[in-house]
């Protein structure tokens, strides 16, 4: 189970109380993180952790530098995965299927939300 408490003190401003440090949210990105940017962060983080899990399980890599760039606009997430140059990708489809199967954040989205995940060249 996951739980949190949110406290708002003025329009377009809130703080979370949950696990770890409080998260301060705003209504506009120019002021800081917003609820939608947190969804974007959650998705990209989940994909990153799934990738780390994949390479730990199938290639024995316990430490792995991964970067995932993610953007969201009008029902469409685009994620680009950047992996270390020396990393061996035997089957890109298998890698992406693993992420699709195990990313619990992605599974929360409605069916009409598009999530494009691809490896950067």
Show the residue positions of the predicted features.
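Alpha-helical metal-binding/catalytic segments enriched in His/Glu/Asp
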Residues: 46-47
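Extended beta-strand/beta-hairpin segments
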Residues: 1-41, 52-121
């Amino acid at each position: 189970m996951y739980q949190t408490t949110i406290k708002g003190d003025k329009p377009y401003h809130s703080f979370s109380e949950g696990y770890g440090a409080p998260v301060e949210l705003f209504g506009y990105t120019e002021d800081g993180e917003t609820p939608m940017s947190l969804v974007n962060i959650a998705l990209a983080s989940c994909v990153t952790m799934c990738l780390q899990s994949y390479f730990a399980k199938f290639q024995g890599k316990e430490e792995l530098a991964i970067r995932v760039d993610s953007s969201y606009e009008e029902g469409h997430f685009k994620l680009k995965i950047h992996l270390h140059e020396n990393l061996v990708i035997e089957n890109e489809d298998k890698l992406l299927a693993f992420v699709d199967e195990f990313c619990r954040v992605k599974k929360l989205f409605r069916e009409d939300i598009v999530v494009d995940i691809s490896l950067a060249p």
